[in-house]
Amino acid sequence: MSTPSVVVFDVNETLSDLTPMGQRFAEVGAPEWTAKLWFASLLRDGFALTAAGATERFSALGEGALRSILAGLPLSRDTDAAVEHIMGGFLELQVHPDVPEGVRSLSASGARLVTLTNGSTEVAEGIFAVAGIRHHFERLLSVEDAGVWKPAPGAYAYAASTCSVDPADMVLVAVHPWDIDGAKRAGLRTAWVNREGRPYPGYFLAPDHSIAAVSELAGVVG
């Protein structure tokens, strides 16, 4: 099997570390664990809209899910201020420690690097600039331009079309099994980043590669 020419990265949790979002919730008086509930809730709603043939921006869903979760909690500030503080945390996220080395190694191998996120490219731009890796990426793609969220086939088809390659000439890198499954069904090769050593769900199509860190990626697809 030939080496894929385009490496497509998911962004949220795959490259960016969402752990600090828990502290943002704590700073407004909400339990830290509500950060994970919030992120899962906004993904759920995005998937539901996609299944219904509709779409919405990540930021709008994030704010809506956040207001629902914060309702009734004894916050340390008013709801509008709490929402602004938490949503602002996305702009200050950093990449996981294994990401810069992995990105540099792949770039040095000659692979074309792009992103495909359910979020916004503006957030990715800022995170990558701080990490010093923005110049390694040919394009930062978002489903906002595809008109459909991952894991719908159209999202991956949009990335392939934009990069002028066949889906089989791309490898999707993600921590989310649902993203791996969606990409596989759309014809892409896949690499699952399993930093926490969790079992892969048997009801999803299995990844072509399983790695513990992005820094291992060049060794399997580069």
What kind of feature is each model-predicted range?
Residues 22-25, 42, 62, 86-90, ...:
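Hydrophobic alpha-helical core bundles mediating ligand binding, dimerization, or RNAP-core interactions
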Residues 22, 35, 39, 59, ...:
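An amphipathic alpha-helix signature
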